[in-house]
Amino acid sequence: MSATLALTEQLIARASVTPDDQHCQQIMTERLAALGFECETIASHGVTNLWAVKRGTDGRDGKLLAFAGHTDVVPTGPLEQWTSPPFIPAHRDGKLYGRGAADMKTSLAAFVVASEEFVAAHPDHRGAIAFLITSDEEGPATDGTVKVVELLQARGERLDYCIVGEPTSTTELGDVVKNGRRGSMSGELVVKGVQGHIAYPHLAKNPIHLLAPALAELAAEQWDAGNEYFPPTTWQVSNLHAGTGATNVIPGHADLLFNFRFSTASTVEGLQARVHAILDKHGLEYTLKWSVSGLPFLTPRGELSGALEHAIRTETGITTELSTTGGTSDGRFIARICPQVIEFGPPNGSIHKIDEHIEVRFVDPLKNVYRRVLEQLIA
């Protein structure tokens, strides 16, 4: 069994359901400390975070490449539906099964073993290697990576490159990497009406009827056309509720929850202003509460993308696709302090599902790609 596969199994065996790290980071810390990493645990409200760094011969003047990821996993769902227990690593048909196998304990193990091999081969490496690991990525993500980033900002720490080990591949290792992500902004809209008897509508104001024309306009609006890297911004309703459940009462208010997934072609302020303009045009009496969970980020083609594409092509023969599709990730926080952030990891077809797994044939090539990037950028 390879070192990467063995460490992956060791991590899967820890039932680290968010935000409980279950000592996964301790396992990683022991391996990294043996290489000369300075390891720091940063705890926050039940969340465990790790910042570990090993400087090269150039000291703080050297380029720094960070590996970022999360030790927490999503809940298992019904245990009886799993073919084998989710926290007991199991091999079947060339696949390793277990919660976190794809998202993202294989990436974590590959980070560690790639670093071990790199340091052994290049003991006098010039640049620095760092690890930014959290147990709060699958949860609220309020005490994880964002807290470490804030701390590093306060210290003036500089990151030059960051690889986030998210499972970005689709069918083959390296067929897709993410060089950016859309932003996410949600709104909680309450449209006020006047409750009344449904037989006397002239004595009431139906907020559903009042909202409907504005809702149709919002749904039809083209917010932007996207750009070279991003598809057009989307606006979607996730929840709509009004009424008491009775059939003879006009509701007093209508509640609407919606979400923007937006690109670098739009801004938070611009989208908010356009929503308010549409609501105001329809004469609605309303309240609207906004929450921004992440801004869009983009890493244009450059040193990191070039090194990663070359490493993937050398290791697998695949020409990779740069993509910005999908949901948000912790990359949105890291981009605040790092100009080049790219996500790359194993195929994602089984993530968050019953019988999550990774094909064993991808495990060591994943580690090799990470090591090749280290060799290209900081040796």
Swiss-Prot record:
Reaction catalysed by this enzyme: N-succinyl-(2S,6S)-2,6-diaminopimelate + H2O = (2S,6S)-2,6-diaminopimelate + succinate
Domain of life, per lineage: Bacteria
Binding residues for Zn(2+) 1: 70, 103, 166
InterPro entries xref list: ArgE/DapE_CS, Bact_exopeptidase_dim_dom, DapE_proteobac, Peptidase_M20, Peptidase_M20_dimer, Peptidase_M20A
Pfam entry (one): Peptidase_M20
Keywords: Amino-acid biosynthesis, Cobalt, Diaminopimelate biosynthesis, Hydrolase, Lysine biosynthesis, Metal-binding, Zinc
Enzyme Commission identifier(s): 3.5.1.18
Protein family: Belongs to the peptidase M20A family. DapE subfamily.
Subunit structure: Homodimer.
Name by which UniProt lists this protein: Succinyl-diaminopimelate desuccinylase
